[in-house]
Amino acid sequence: RICATGFELLRQAGEQLRDGVELALCVGAESMSRNPIAAYTHRDGFRLGASVDFKDFLWEALYDPAPGLDMIATAENLARRHGLSREAVDTYALNSHEQALQTQTSGWFADEIVAVRNESFELDGYQPRGITLPRRVDAVTLDSHIRPTDFLALATLRAIHAGGVQTAGNSCAVVDGAA
């Protein structure tokens, strides 16, 4: 799973507490920017010059093979089922954007955010690993997805699927996160 792992952990902890566990610690992290890419066609090697079929796990994880739908199509089906108009979805998204911006601006979660910095991790016998931020970025201290918007900006965005209600402005972002 790649979405809502923090919420899933809270749900599981709640079940365990209900069943008698005295203490539950929930930690979740999602690194969408470092999602792996795999090659499944290399078991017998590659022919020189032959193309290699790579599969992006991110897009695979955003697609549910049981009904044959991606996450946006699932959201569109739910919008149709519950009679949600584009205007209603954009209004809800605007409210969410405004609350997130107000919370970030007020510093409500400032004590809970740990800055991510360029860092190297080394252990004898292993290759060094690390975190490398873009040039001229010393640290990431805020959620980069939260930014001001208005209803007109949301309303002018093109729907992802023709005739649908989901847009880049009212859908969940594909970002790194932790809970």
Predicted segment positions?
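Active-site-proximal alpha-helical scaffold in enzymes
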Residues: 1-30, 79-109, 177
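Conserved catalytic cysteine-centered active-site region
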Residues: 1-23, 65-71, 147-173
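Phenylalanine-focused residue identity feature
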Residues: 7, 46, 54-57, 109, ...
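Flexible glycine-/small-residue-enriched beta->alpha junction loops
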Residues: 14, 23-78
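Charged, low-complexity, helix/coiled-coil-prone segments
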Residues: 19-45, 124-126, 159-175
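Short amphipathic alpha-helical segments at helix-loop
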Residues: 56-60, 77-85, 163-167
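N-terminal extracellular/periplasmic Venus flytrap/periplasmic-binding protein-like
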Residues: 88-179
